[in-house]
Amino acid sequence: MTNTKSNVTKKSLHPRNKHTGNYDFPALIKACAELKPFVETNQYGNESINFSDPQAVKALNKALLAHFYNVPFWDIPQGYLCPPIPGRADYIHNIADLLAITNEGTIPTGKKVKGLDVGVGANCVYLIIGNREYQWSFVGSDIDPQSIKMASFIANNNPSLKGIECRLQKNEENIFKGIIKPTEFFDFTMCNPPFHASEAEATAGTERKQKNLAANKAKKGHAFQEMQNAKALNFGGQKAELWCEGGELAFILKMAQQSREFSLQVQWFTTLISKKENVAELYKELEKIGVKTIKTIEMAQGQKISRFVAWTYQANVNL
């Protein structure tokens, strides 16, 4: 049994992340003119956008994906999760480092490397970044037909994206079964699990984020208009994206249990974990079912610390 936990508190994005430093708004506007109306000069004399405005955040995402990843077409339906691109890129780059561990220290690239994004959502962002940065092939799964439809539309309407397939999970109780085919092998799986245990909890979380953003902007002297729509895009999300019965812990424990059936078809299973206290619970479950190697990888974006846990049933992995 090999267990490792990162004890280093990081303060910056992954060194290969393209989104370090300030946004180059002239370049982003050149890539996506839709961003221009949302860019304004703040009290410090810097160009920025109002991050409390969901349309501004959506336009910024469009520009980032067009400029950095040559993905000119990107959109999401109203009310679906609009993820921050830099943090999503960090997960991908850290997975690349993880794959190097079982590839003689070299990051594997190309279409033969295959990943599964559990809960791809309508935004398709992980698949876009992994495909464009490392040319990996991807399968994205989701229980929401609209998410699959939109993610597939994005993948099929950007010529730069190759080897991306989206599959509908027809049974909400299954995570891998019904998605991973009998003869398929995946180098890794990834997941941003539902955080909340109920819709009421998810709504309360959205409102709390909005209040915190308002307070932070007030401290900095920015004018702030309270968002009336509790499902603002940058804090939005459908049921499958935000909550499930039992919340994050129940979901990741189910993932651990169901991973056993696919131990020979997946090199590395991984999942983000928002609540730090859930890491120990996942470790206990993985050890109980006989996982050989478990690793926790910390990531950071400014003051925000996030993490994902990775595990493999392969023995003798030298971490």
Swiss-Prot record:
Functional note: Specifically methylates the adenine in position 1618 of 23S rRNA.
Query: SUPFAM superfamilies this protein is in?
Result: S-adenosyl-L-methionine-dependent methyltransferases
Q: What class of enzyme is it?
A: transferase
What are the recorded GO MF terms, alphabetically? Answer: 23S rRNA (adenine(1618)-N(6))-methyltransferase activity
**The protein's Enzyme Commission number:** 2.1.1.181
Q: Give a Pfam family name.
A: Methyltransf_10
Q: Where in the cell is it found?
A: Cytoplasm
| Matching InterPro entries | METTL16/RlmF, rRNA_lsu_MeTfrase_F, SAM-dependent_MTases_sf
Spell out the reaction equation it catalyses.
Answer: adenosine(1618) in 23S rRNA + S-adenosyl-L-methionine = N(6)-methyladenosine(1618) in 23S rRNA + S-adenosyl-L-homocysteine + H(+)
**Keywords from the UniProt entry:** Cytoplasm, Methyltransferase, rRNA processing, S-adenosyl-L-methionine, Transferase
Cystine crosslinks: none
UniProt xrefs under NCBIfam families = PRK11727.1
Its gene name is rlmF
The record ties this protein, via HAMAP family, to: 23SrRNA_methyltr_F
Task: Name one cellular component (GO) term.
Answer: cytoplasm
GO terms in the biological process aspect are: rRNA base methylation
Q: What is this protein called?
A: Ribosomal RNA large subunit methyltransferase F
